[in-house]
From Swiss-Prot:
Pathway linked to the protein: Amino-acid biosynthesis; L-lysine biosynthesis via DAP pathway; (S)-tetrahydrodipicolinate from L-aspartate: step 4/4
Name listed for the protein in its UniProt record: 4-hydroxy-tetrahydrodipicolinate reductase
Catalyzed chemical reaction(s): (S)-2,3,4,5-tetrahydrodipicolinate + NAD(+) + H2O = (2S,4S)-4-hydroxy-2,3,4,5-tetrahydrodipicolinate + NADH + H(+); (S)-2,3,4,5-tetrahydrodipicolinate + NADP(+) + H2O = (2S,4S)-4-hydroxy-2,3,4,5-tetrahydrodipicolinate + NADPH + H(+)
Positions annotated to bind (S)-2,3,4,5-tetrahydrodipicolinate: 160, 169-170
NCBIfam families assigned to the protein according to its UniProt record, in alphabetical order: dapB
Assigned protein family: Belongs to the DapB family.
Annotated NADP(+) binding sites: 39
Molecular function terms, GO-annotated: 4-hydroxy-tetrahydrodipicolinate reductase; NAD binding; NADP binding; oxidoreductase activity, acting on CH or CH2 groups, NAD or NADP as acceptor
Keyword terms: Amino-acid biosynthesis, Cytoplasm, Diaminopimelate biosynthesis, Lysine biosynthesis, NAD, NADP, Oxidoreductase
Catalytic residue list: 159, 163
Subcellular location: Cytoplasm
Main location (coarse class): cytoplasm
Annotated GO CC locations: cytosol
Source species of the chain: Serratia proteamaculans (strain 568)
Length: 273
């Protein structure tokens, strides 16, 4: 631990989220952009990362590999794709670099790899880095404890047309929060699609519905529906900056933890509520 600035590397720096992350690093106290990574062969290699993100020249050029910038960063923030994240993870374990992982769509093997890596380096792994979403997850646990056993539970999520995984990682996290509060296994009670003659609804199921359209940043609603009333808990994001700022906040928090697997509940100390 040091009083100097925390050096952040941003993976996928040429993407929508990567540029937002660079902006968030520039706006946050106590951190500085140390490196920016893009895929090999990208036309952005060699570009100034600050100019790419619209914050002015920073003197940090986009690189095509972590090996080339290994001495330039302390923590990697990665919102890319599972296969890229796992490759970065192996590198960070080898070189004792901490990671903030916002990538979604991992299979069980990928999640196991992240858990194992948390025994050697510090990792914050979350489906959503928005402070509001993580507060919603806490509220859902409370709602499930009060209403979950006698209501029908449905989760509806909407994202932009370019999102490649469904349901979203946040929707699944909402389902896990609810199922955990009710002592259920989400793998056993989740219903991801309904078509044709489905029969009556299983009262113990948790349903998911997905929308992909336009430029929706992210909207999630959990519904607890009874006869005569229903409670809906909704979060709507209007800018990716909320996720980027949360990820940088997580990186600042993680700098004080040498190893361990954490999520935003830890960063925000939500378990104390």
């Amino acid at each position: 631990m040091t009083d100097s600035l925390i050096r952040i590397a941003v993976a996928g720096s040429g993407g929508r989220m990567g540029r937002q992350l660079i902006q968030a690093v520039q706006q946050a106290p106590g951190v500085v952009l140390g490196a920016a990574i893009s895929r090999p062969g990208s036309s952005l290699i060699g570009t100034d990362a600050g100019e790419l993100a619209g914050v002015g020249a920073l003197g940090v050029t986009v690189s095509d590999s972590l090996e080339k910038v290994v001495d330039d960063f302390d923590i990697l923030i990665d919102f890319t794709r599972p296969e890229s994240t796992l490759a970065y993870l192996a590198f960070c374990v080898e070189h004792k670099k901490a990671m903030v992982i916002g990538t979604t769509g991992f299979d069980d093997a990928g999640k196991d790899a992240i858990r194992a890596a948390g025994q050697q380096i510090g990792i914050v792994f979350a489906a959503n880095f928005s402070v509001g979403v993580n507060l919603v997850l806490k509220l859902l646990e409370k709602a499930a404890q009060v209403m979950g056993d006698y209501t029908d539970i449905e989760i509806i999520e909407a994202h932009h047309r370019h999102k490649v995984d469904a349901p979203s990682g946040t929707a699944l996290a909402m389902g896990e929060a609810i199922a955990g509060a009710l002592g259920r296994d989400l793998k056993e009670c989740a219903v991801y699609a309904r078509e044709g003659y489905t029969g009556e609804r299983d009262p113990k199921s948790i349903g998911f519905a997905t929308v992909r359209a336009g430029d929706i940043v992210g909207e999630h609603t959990a519904m607890f529906a009874d006869i005569g009333e229903r409670v809906e808990i909704t979060h709507k994001a209007s800018s990716r900056m909320t996720f980027a700022s949360g990820a940088v906040r997580a990186a600042s928090w993680l700098h004080n933890h040498d190893k361990g697997l954490f999520d935003m509940r830890d960063v925000l100390n939500l378990d104390q509520l």
